[in-house]
Structures are given as structure tokens and as C-alpha cells.
């Protein structure tokens, strides 16, 4: 049976967003990249020179920034827009944003604002959501829950491959950064990262995006258009 909602969880750098978007294209689903939404909040905090440790101030920023988020459903799925621009096209991967994300994402009121957007998208049609607490908190009713399990070394290698010429980080530096983020996500008081009891765990160290998507498509029992 074709699932209406697919939850994809996993640690930082596990490929949730990439695989989720590829799967959304194959299935004609809307794709909600939770990480990008929190990055949008982090950018708002930085742009407004707001203290990321001030919960009430961060909440005000999140409400203001996320007010402009809309979903444009199409015949091929759906696009998350911010003030009329696709969320995926915004520049949200600067190092200062990356460092700020876990600090703003730890606040429960902020997470609830984000959850309201996620649940609204789910209510409007077939949706794929990628994050760290999708299957456990955001959409525990999702018909298909996935957890992408990737070694720290492989995640760091992927980050290194994708980094810009200006970054020039070493494998050890990236591993340390990812390990720190993993610890913060696991130990967060609000909605910590964990594997849902009914999630399918997929180890993707030696798998391509297309191979992973093919496995998920097979789980859905569907024959779909080949990846372009």
C-alpha cells in the first residue's frame, strides 16, 4: 500500500535530505527538509543579532520567519516556499548558521512552531519528512519510517567531498564536529534523536542515493519511474 507519509530520520550528514528529495521526485511527494527550516530560523537569529541562548527571543524570531512558509502542491509533488522562494534555493549552509542550528533547535516552543508547519504539510497530501525526530515525535503515525545509519567516518568523508574550496577542513575536524552534533542531538532534553521502534534501519555506507531510493520504493511495493 502506498504510504501517505514517509518519515526519514538519522544523524547529521547521513544523507536524509538528499535521499528524501530523490525519493520525493520518484514518488511525486512533497518534501519537508526539517534541517533547512531550523537553518532558516538560525539565519533569522543571526541576521537580527539575537542571542541564540535566549529562548523567548529565538521563539519570536521563529514565529516571524516561519510565518512566510507556504506549500505549493503540484502534479509532481510539492515545494516548500519562503516568501515565494523555494526553501531549497536559499543560502542556508554557512558555517555560522550550522553552528547556531543546534542552539535554536533545542527549545521546545521553537520545535512546536516547526512541527505545526510539518503537520500542515502532512495534512495536505503525500509527504516525505526528513529530520531527527520525525518518526518519534512529529509523525509517529507515518506509514513508513526509515532511519539512515551511517558511520561517522563515512559521514565526514561525504562532508569533505561536498565542502567548498574556502572551508578546507580535515577529516578529523569534520568527524569531531559531527560527533559533537550527534551528542547534542542524542542528549537534547526535547525530542532527542532516537530510532523509532517500528522504523526500518538502512545502513547506507556503501550505497548510492539511487540504490537507497530503490530499496525504499521496493518497500512501498511500487513500480515507479526510473531516476533521471
Q: For the regions a protein language model found, what residue spans apply to each?
A:
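Small-molecule kinase domains that catalyze NTP-dependent phosphoryl transfer to phosphate-bearing small molecules
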Residues: 118-124, 132-137, 141, 166-215
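P-loop (Walker A) phosphate-binding loop of NTP-binding proteins
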Residues: 11
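N-terminal phosphate/diphosphate-binding loop that engages ATP/GTP or pyrophosphate donors
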Residues: 25-92
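Walker A (P-loop) ATP-phosphate-binding motif of ABC ATPase nucleotide-binding domains
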Residues: 5
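Conserved lysine of the Walker
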Residues: 16
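Hydrophobic positions on the alpha1 helix immediately C-terminal to the Walker A/P-loop
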Residues: 19
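Hydrophobic anchor at the beta1->P-loop junction of P-loop NTPases
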Residues: 8
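ATP-dependent NMP and nucleoside kinases share a basic, alpha-helical "lid"
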Residues: 88-165
